[in-house]
């Protein structure tokens, strides 16, 4: 139990999928202008990342490995992710049309979010059990969610301040993301 808790802390805070592994930067930078849209993207990505990691593990261990079809792993995982994204998009469009409009193109782009595919592939590479895979996927997703919402809050606050013209927009966003990454590096002592 202690190992699973340490894995969750290490994954969510220390080895954060965005700030440490640099996965999922497209949606991280693109949707983090407002807290509301960042929270919507965080929820959608959390669902897709967690579910795709678990379903990917099942496909790997129940179909691909027994049949010697490991070379189809990438294709199978992409199909799982695309299916889950379609389900998520249908749900969001029906439940919250405003959020669906806010997320725009970024919702279907979860299909190509390298964080989702990367975490699913990492769990297979590290030969984790199903429970470890679930914890790994969920903690990575929650770490992504935490960072994108914090970053959106920081960007909203920065929009209300006077900024030098040279730093407006992307330059200040990248500097802010770098400072956030340094802050999360302070959690390194938690993982042992």
What label would you give each PLM region?
Residues 23-37, 85-99, 151-162:
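C-terminal ends of transmembrane helices
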Residues 22-30, 89-94, 105-107, 114-127:
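Generic transmembrane alpha-helix signature in multi-pass membrane proteins
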Residues 7, 14, 45, 50, ...:
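Hydrophobic core segments of alpha-helical transmembrane domains in multi-pass membrane transport
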Residues 3-18, 67-83, 134-147:
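Structural signature of hydrophobic alpha-helical transmembrane segments
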Residues 156-174:
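Interfacial loop-to-transmembrane junctions
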Residues 1-5, 58-71, 121-134, 188-192:
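Helix-coil boundary and interhelical linker segments in multi-pass alpha-helical membrane proteins
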Residues 61-104:
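Ordered, amphipathic secondary-structure segments that act as subunit-interaction surfaces
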Residues 36-47, 71-77, 99-110, 166-172:
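Cytoplasmic-side transmembrane-helix entry/capping segments in multi-pass membrane proteins
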């Amino acid at each position: 139990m202690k190992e699973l808790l340490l894995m969750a802390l290490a994954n969510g805070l220390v080895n954060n999928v965005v700030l440490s592994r640099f996965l999922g930067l497209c949606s991280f930078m693109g949707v983090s202008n407002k807290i509301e849209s960042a929270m919507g993207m965080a929820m959608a990505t959390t669902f897709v990342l967690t579910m795709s990691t678990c379903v990917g593990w099942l496909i790997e261990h129940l179909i691909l490995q027994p049949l010697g079809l490991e070379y189809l792993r990438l294709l199978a995982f992409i199909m799982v992710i695309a299916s889950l994204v379609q389900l998520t998009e249908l749900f969001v469009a029906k439940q919250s049309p405003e959020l669906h409009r806010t997320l725009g193109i970024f919702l279907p782009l979860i299909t190509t979010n390298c964080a989702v595919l990367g975490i699913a592939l990492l769990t297979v590479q590290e030969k984790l059990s199903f429970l470890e895979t679930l914890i790994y996927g969920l903690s990575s997703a929650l770490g992504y969610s935490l960072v994108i919402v914090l970053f959106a809050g920081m960007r909203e606050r920065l929009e209300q301040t006077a900024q030098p013209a040279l730093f407006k927009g992307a330059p200040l966003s990248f500097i802010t993301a770098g400072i956030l990454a340094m802050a999360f590096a302070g959690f390194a002592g938690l993982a042992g």
